[in-house]
């Protein structure tokens, strides 16, 4: 077990699931929970602590009331934000959650300027941008969990097409966390073979569509919520890479500085994760078609950022 402390701000379905996995798997020494509803964080801390009595975990989990309590966290996960409500426009949701994330980042900056920040709040790419712009944090220390989840969903749909065989599936998805994401077919393999060697074009096209709609499908089925197990596990993979300084490659939302031909825009791209957060952005040689799709994805994120610049930061 790492002698590390992880803070989770926002203890809804994703935050509480994440805390449960961290605690019961002995991934860190301490977990701090904070929610706008204090009773929620207290309840989750108690419930998870009691569940741990049936495990070999020694992790301590604590509900926090004060932002100062996060001063010693090595990693802070931000899941705070509201879901879109009936009659609420996407612009209203964007501004509302930007206010929440900016407020959280202001508190973190005052109390812990050294932690690695992982954003899960939606709209993801815009919230990563908000966190960066509203704080004095180094760019490599703020990243978003998105592409890792999208890649996991793509892997699932490939396995589904193949009948769930015991094979090694690797996938890569770049771009914004939404309908404009770009699943990279040429960089996705099954036991080292390219997808078009094991699946038909029709099957691959279907996988791309299902990957883009993966989150929406779950929202539709749940009716009053969204996915939380897969997002939590994707975040766990990122946390372990940072805590253990593995230098493994993950698709994460980060701010670009000339990579792929774009600057000062947040998008999901392959990165090397280690103890310092985003240690390197990997530029893949993508096709002209994928470049066009990536450009469309970037423009979609830019639209949201322009709304923030004109109605929130201005």
Swiss-Prot record:
It catalyses: (S)-malate + NAD(+) = oxaloacetate + NADH + H(+). The keyword NAD applies. Coiled coil: none annotated. GO terms for biological process: carboxylic acid metabolic process; tricarboxylic acid cycle. Keywords: NAD, Oxidoreductase, Tricarboxylic acid cycle. The keyword NAD applies. Substrate binds at residues 84, 90, 122, 153. The active site is at residue 177. Its EC number is 1.1.1.37. NAD(+) binds at residues 9-15, 97, 120-122. GO terms for cellular component: cytoplasm. GO terms for molecular function: L-malate dehydrogenase (NAD+) activity. Disulfide bonds: none annotated. Catalyzes the reversible oxidation of malate to oxaloacetate. NCBIfam families: PRK06223.1. Belongs to the LDH/MDH superfamily. This is Malate dehydrogenase. It comes from Aliarcobacter butzleri (strain RM4018). The lineage of its organism: Bacteria, Pseudomonadati, Campylobacterota, Epsilonproteobacteria, Campylobacterales. The gene is mdh.
């Amino acid at each position: 077990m790492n002698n590390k402390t992880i803070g989770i701000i926002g203890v809804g379905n994703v935050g509480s699931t994440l805390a449960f996995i961290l605690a019961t798997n002995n991934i860190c020494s301490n977990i701090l929970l904070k929610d706008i509803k204090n009773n929620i964080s207290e309840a989750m801390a108690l419930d998870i602590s009691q569940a741990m009595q049936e495990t070999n975990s020694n992790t301590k989990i604590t509900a926090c009331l004060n932002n100062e309590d996060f001063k010693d966290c090595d990693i802070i996960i931000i899941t705070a934000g509201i879901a879109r409500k009936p009659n609420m426009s996407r612009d209203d949701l964007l501004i509302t959650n930007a206010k929440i994330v900016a407020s959280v980042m202001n508190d973190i900056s005052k109390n812990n300027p050294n932690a690695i920040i992982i954003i899960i709040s939606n709209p993801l790419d815009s919230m990563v941008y908000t966190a960066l712009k509203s704080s004095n944090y180094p760019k490599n220390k703020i990243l978003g969990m998105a592409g890792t989840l999208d890649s996991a969903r793509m892997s699932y749909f490939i396995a589904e097409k193949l009948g769930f065989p015991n094979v090694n599936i690797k996938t890569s998805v770049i771009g914004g966390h939404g309908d404009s994401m770009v699943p990279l077919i040429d960089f996705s393999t099954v036991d080292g073979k390219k997808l078009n060697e094991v699946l038909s074009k029709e099957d691959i096209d279907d996988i791309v569509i299902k990957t883009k709609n993966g989150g929406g499908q779950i929202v539709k089925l749940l009716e009053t919520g969204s996915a939380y197990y897969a997002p939590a596990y994707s975040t766990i993979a990122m946390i372990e890479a940072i805590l253990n300084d593995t230098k493994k490659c993950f698709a994460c939302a980060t701010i670009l500085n000339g990579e792929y031909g774009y600057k000062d825009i947040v998008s999901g791209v392959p990165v090397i994760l280690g103890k310092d957060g985003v240690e390197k952005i990997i530029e893949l040689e993508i096709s002209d078609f994928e470049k066009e799709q990536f450009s469309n994805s970037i423009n979609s994120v830019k639209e949201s950022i322009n709304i923030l610049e004109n109605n929130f930061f201005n």
